[in-house]
């Protein structure tokens, strides 16, 4: 039976990833591919918590790198369901780099991931509805639908 769930049911807020030397590229900044993988994994956890089923990544929208992150910094991550449709949902992910020695935090990357919930035969299945409660959640809910409409127009 499909349910209505609040954003808080499945969100991740404050996940921390410590940057070590093996996370760096040739410029001694965090490797972009590592960030992309981290974002996809966090978004997947949120999607599967919400749907209570296996989900597959269908689309990545607006993935942007705003600033570099460096060795020794912490990556602070937030991910939440923005909107659900019949068999899919959008999860927004945002990451900040934290330098605890300088007492600074800066936004380094964000993205929107669309997932499709699937059954054991890899066929799409209906997902639970999301219930936005706060003004911020309602804003993200509406913006997610605009992004989806823009994607559908590109087809």
Swiss-Prot record:
UniProt-recorded Gene Ontology molecular function terms: long-chain fatty acyl-CoA hydrolase activity
EC number: 3.1.2.-
Source organism: Chlamydia pneumoniae
SUPFAM superfamilies named among the record's database cross-references: Thioesterase/thiol ester dehydrase-isomerase (SSF54637)
Single GO cellular component term: cytosol
Classification via PROSITE patterns: HOTDOG_ACOT
S-S pairs: none
Top-level class of the enzyme under EC nomenclature: hydrolase
Domain HotDog ACOT-type as annotated: residue spans: 9-121
Annotated GO biological process: acyl-CoA metabolic process
Protein name: Uncharacterized acyl-CoA thioester hydrolase CPn_0654/CP_0093/CPj0654/CpB0680
Key words, A-Z: Hydrolase
PANTHER family reported for this sequence: ACYL COENZYME A THIOESTER HYDROLASE, PROTEIN VDLD
Family designation: Belongs to the acyl coenzyme A hydrolase family.
Annotated InterPro entries: Cytosol_ACT, HOTDOG_ACOT, HotDog_dom_sf, Thioestr_dom
């Amino acid at each position: 039976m499909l349910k209505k769930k609040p954003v808080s049911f499945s969100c991740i807020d404050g996940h921390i990833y410590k940057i070590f030397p093996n996370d760096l590229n040739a410029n001694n900044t965090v490797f972009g591919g590592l960030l992309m993988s981290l974002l996809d994994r966090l978004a997947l956890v949120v999607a599967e918590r919400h749907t209570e089923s296996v989900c597959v990544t269908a689309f990545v929208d607006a993935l942007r790198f705003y600033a570099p992150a460096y060795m020794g910094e912490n990556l602070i991550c937030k991910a939440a369901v923005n909107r659900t449709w019949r068999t899919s949902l959008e999860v927004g992910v945002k990451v900040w780099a934290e330098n605890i020695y300088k007492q600074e935090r800066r936004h380094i990357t964000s993205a929107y991931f669309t997932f499709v919930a699937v059954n054991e035969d890899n066929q799409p299945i209906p997902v639970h509805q999301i219930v936005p409660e706060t003004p911020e959640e309602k804003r993200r809910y509406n913006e997610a639908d605009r992004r989806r409409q823009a994607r559908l127009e590109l087809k």
